[in-house]
C-alpha cells in the first residue's frame, strides 16, 4: 500500500472475511448462499449486492456455454480434492449429481433468485475476485491511498493506481510444472487499476494410478477438465470476471478460450502440456517469458 494514512490492512482483512461469511460460505447457515441452497426449489430474495454479482456470474456462465458454471459445487465436494478424502468417484455417483448441474437451473429476476429443486450455488470460483472488487471499492473511498497491490492467495491479484515512480506492477506467473516454488514461467506487467487471475492444474490435485486429478472441473462431465491446458492467466477490468474467465478458459482450451476473452476485452495467457505458451494480442505487450523450457506460439484462429 502507498498511503499517507494509518495501516489499512486490518480493515481490508475484515472486508474479505465479511464477503466469505455473507456470500461464499456453505457451512454458515446465516450466509445468503446457504439460505439460497436451503430453499432450493423456491424463490429467495437476496441483497442488491449479491444480485449484482449473480447477474454477472450467470452472464459469464452463458457466454462460456457453461464452461464456467456456479452450480457445480456438489461435484467439487464429491471429489473432495482439497479435503481429507480426495478420490475418484463412481460414475453412478457423478451421473446422479450431474442431474442438478447447469446454470440454466437458476432464474434471476432482480433481487429474486429461484433454484430448481436439487440445484445449488457455489461462488467459490469467483470468491477471490469478488474480494478484489470489494477491496477496490473500499480503496476508492480512502483519499490517502494513492496506489496498492493486493494478492489474495497467489491466484488473484489486484493493482490500484500507479506506482510513485510510474513503472508497471510486475506479477510473476508460476511455471505449472516447476519443481520449485521460485521457478516462474514469466512476468505479467499490470498498469493502473487491473485484475489478474490464474487457474492451473498444479494448484490443488491428487495423483492416483499415475493420473493427475485437479480441482478445475468440467461441468459437462463432472471430471477434471481435459483441454490440453495446464495453466491460464487472465487480465481484465474486474476481479470477478478475471476469476470466472480464467476458469472458463482452462475448461475451453486455447482457441475457444481466446475467443471468449475477446468478448470481454480481456488479455490471456495459456500454457499447454507440451510447454507452449499462447498469448492473446494484448498479453503479448505485457508478458515476459523467463522459463527456458517453454516457447511462445501463435493462437490459431
List where the protein language model places each region.
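Mature catalytic core of soluble alpha/beta enzymes
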Residues: 1-301
